[in-house]
UniProtKB/Swiss-Prot annotation:
The protein's name: 5-aminovalerate aminotransferase DavT
Positions where N6-(pyridoxal phosphate)lysine occurs in the chain: K269
Reactions mediated catalytically: 5-aminopentanoate + 2-oxoglutarate = 5-oxopentanoate + L-glutamate
Binding-site list for pyridoxal 5'-phosphate: G112, S113, Y139, D240, E241, V242, Q243, T298
PANTHER family listed in its UniProt record: AMINOTRANSFERASE CLASS III, LEUCINE_METHIONINE RACEMASE
Native source organism of the sequence: Pseudomonas putida (strain ATCC 47054 / DSM 6125 / CFBP 8728 / NCIMB 11950 / KT2440)
CDD domains xref list: OAT_like
Keywords assigned: Aminotransferase, Pyridoxal phosphate, Transferase
Broad class of enzyme this protein falls into: transferase
InterPro entries, alphabetized: 4NH2But_aminotransferase_bac, Aminotrans_3, Aminotrans_3_PPA_site, Class-III_PLP-dep_AT, PyrdxlP-dep_Trfase, PyrdxlP-dep_Trfase_major, PyrdxlP-dep_Trfase_small
Entry's induction text: Induced in response to corn root exudates, by lysine and by 5-aminovalerate.
Cofactor annotation: pyridoxal 5'-phosphate
Lineage, top ranks: Bacteria, Pseudomonadati, Pseudomonadota, Gammaproteobacteria, Pseudomonadales
Disruption phenotype: Mutants are impaired in lysine utilization and show a slight reduction in the root colonization capacity.
Length: 425
């Protein structure tokens, strides 16, 4: 009996909890570079990239070869029991790639949420404090601490009761939405006045470009002023680069463009070309604050994932993917702005590097238009293009196409997006 998307969806509904959402009713059979083929043999352009995991594309040959070679040596020992060189070599490379003119060390884990959890643990141990300031619209994961840090309730923490204490929320600036950098800094200072003294705050955490929050880049001025506040009060600045890292913004880490260095940086997603790997890199003195046994995990920094990540870094160097990231972003932005001229419901086209978004409003207003975005996503799928939405109100289209995508494929995707807006306008 041949498999269909519908038959597999029936099995999925019966076997998998409904809390595991699924944006597209499609089951993938194979994938290569920037396209996927579903179980019914239909080819689709992938502008989602596994939610920012496939910057080097599906099954990059160099990554596949590195994993195959590692599989002939060792697949697992648990680094805390028997160590292996790929873990150490990768940490050495990450220490050089993360911005900051100071000695660094790196911890490898498995998921982005796990990386953020460990960054908070490290900050607490290093400062002897417990409080953390996060931002409206921020996304940091689905574990309990990271849910508390995440600035959106539905769907992530709805119905789960109170989140962990000691988390405080500041405003994230967006000129489009009427929140200035002054407003954001004032909201941090109000926390110091109304909720917790600075001496009780271990860390301030934010994304250099908000991901789920709508692809809103943090202004450089915000980062500089947060860095100054952290230095003034002995607070650690954590940059959550889970979605922005590994070249998505045109530099290997987005903080390279912000003019300041964070104390701790989290990374995951595209770092290992589709294999589960994440980590925290930071000042050596802070990374060493936790005693032996306080960090790690059974699968953390697996040999397979480390081999994949080392190959990813080589691919970036050999194929000049940072330059390509900028070029992809410029091409997408130019095309989307041409579409914007024709369809006034498109209120903004923005991004950093190739982390590009389109915000959609009700015509002639700044009222979020999630329905239109939902229509575009559905129509694009019918036409052979996979898109994602994001934003606090679900009214933002985001593009996370592999950096290895050819220009012709980018143009085809843009043409489909324009067709979709033409049909709903």
């Amino acid at each position: 009996m041949s498999k269909t998307n519908e038959s597999l969806m029936q099995r999925r509904v019966a076997a998998v909890p409904r809390g595991v959402g699924q944006i597209h009713p499609i089951f993938v059979d194979t994938a290569k570079n920037s396209t996927v083929i579903d179980v019914e043999g239909r080819e689709l352009i992938d502008f989602a990239g596994g939610i920012a995991v496939l910057n080097t594309g599906h099954l990059h040959p160099k990554v596949v070869a590195a994993v195959q070679e590692q599989l002939t040596k060792v697949s697992h020992t648990c680094f805390q029991v028997l160590a292996y060189e790929p873990y150490v070599e990768l940490c050495e490379k990450i220490n050089k790639l993360v911005p900051g003119d100071f000695d660094k060390k790196t911890l490898l884990v498995t998921t982005g949420s796990e990386a953020v959890e460990n960054a908070v643990k490290i900050a607490r141990a290093a400062t002897g404090r417990a409080g953390v300031i996060a931002f409206t619209g921020g996304y940091h994961g689905r574990t309990m601490m990271t849910l508390g840090l995440t600035g959106k309730v539905v769907p992530y923490s709805a119905g789960m009761g109170l989140m962990p204490g000691g988390i405080f929320r500041a405003l994230f600036p967006s000129e489009l939405h009427g929140i200035s950098v002054d407003d954001a800094i004032a909201s941090v200072e109000r926390i110091f006045k109304n909720d917790a003294e600075p001496r009780d705050i271990a860390a301030i955490i934010l994304e250099p470009v908000q991901g789920e929050g709508g692809f809103l880049p943090a202004p450089k001025e915000l980062m500089k002023r947060l860095r100054a506040l952290c230095d003034q009060h002995g607070i650690l600045l954590i940059a959550d680069e889970v979605q922005t890292g590994a070249g998505r913004t045109g530099t290997f880490f987005a903080m390279e463009q912000m003019g300041v260095a964070p104390d701790l940086t989290t990374f995951a997603k595209s770092i290992a070309g589709g294999f589960p790997l994440a980590g925290v890199c930071g000042k050596a003195e802070y990374m060493d604050a936790i005693a032996p046994g306080g960090l790690g995990g059974t699968y953390a920094g697996s040999p397979i994932a480390c081999a994949a990540a080392l190959a990813v870094i080589e691919v970036f160097e050999e194929e000049k993917l940072l330059d390509r990231s900028k070029a992809v972003g410029e091409r997408l932005t130019a095309g989307l702005r041409e579409i914007q001229k024709k369809y006034p419901i498109i209120g903004d086209v923005r991004g950093l590097g190739s982390m590009i978004a389109v915000e959609v409003f009700e015509k002639g207003t700044h009222t979020p238009n999630a329905a239109a975005v939902g229509q575009v996503v559905a129509k694009a799928r019918e036409k052979g293009l996979i898109l994602l939405s994001c934003g606090t109100y679900g009214n933002v289209l985001r593009i996370l196409v592999p950096l290895t995508a050819e220009d012709a494929l980018l143009d085809k995707g843009l043409a489909i997006i324009e067709e979709c807006f033409a049909e709903i306008a």
